[in-house]
A protein has these predicted regions:
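Extended, charge-rich helix/loop segments that form flexible
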Residues: 115-118
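Active-site gating loops and adjacent loop-to-helix segments of metal-dependent hydrolytic enzymes
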Residues: 80-105
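A general, composition-driven signal for non-globular sequence regions
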Residues: 13-15, 104-107
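An N-terminally biased module of ancient metal coordination in phosphate/nucleic-acid-related enzymes
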Residues: 1-84
Length: 118
C-alpha cells in the first residue's frame, strides 16, 4: 500500500512473545500444541522458556517451522539472589544438548536444597 506521497506503508510489526511455558515445566500445552497455539494467535516469533529445562525446545521448533512461526530456544532459570528467588530468562540458546545436561545437574542441586529445608 502507498500513501498519497507515493511512499510505501511500513510493514506490519511482527507479533512476538518471548516468555511462554509448555508441559515440559508448568505450562498446559505440549510443545507441539504451544507452536500451534502461537500460529493460531498470529504470532511470528515465540520463545519457549520452560522452568529449568530445555526438554521441549526441539519439539516446538519442529512443530512451528511448517506453521511459519519462529521458536527462539530459551529457558527460565530459578536462581537465588541472597535469600530471594529470581527468575532469569535465557534466550537464543545454542548448544541445547550441553545446556540440557547442565540443567539436569542444576535441577538435582535444587531438589537437594529443597529436601534439606524440609
Amino acid at each position: 500500500m502507498t500513501n498519497p506521497h507515493g511512499a510505501s506503508a511500513p510493514a506490519a510489526a511482527p507479533r512476538i512473545d518471548l516468555h511462554a511455558h509448555s508441559t515440559a515445566s508448568d505450562g498446559t500445552a505440549s510443545p507441539t500444541q504451544f507452536a500451534e497455539t502461537a500460529a493460531l494467535a498470529g504470532l511470528n516469533v515465540v520463545a519457549l522458556t520452560d522452568h529449568d529445562t530445555v526438554d521441549g525446545v526441539a519439539e516446538a521448533v519442529a512443530a512451528a517451522a511448517p506453521l511459519g512461526v519462529r521458536v527462539v530456544p530459551g529457558v527460565e532459570l530459578s536462581v537465588m539472589d541472597g535469600r530471594d528467588e529470581v527468575h532469569l530468562l535465557g534466550l537464543h540458546l545454542a548448544h541445547i544438548e550441553a545446556i540440557a545436561a547442565a540443567l539436569v545437574t542444576f535441577q538435582q542441586g535444587r531438589r537437594e536444597r529443597a529436601e534439606a529445608m524440609v
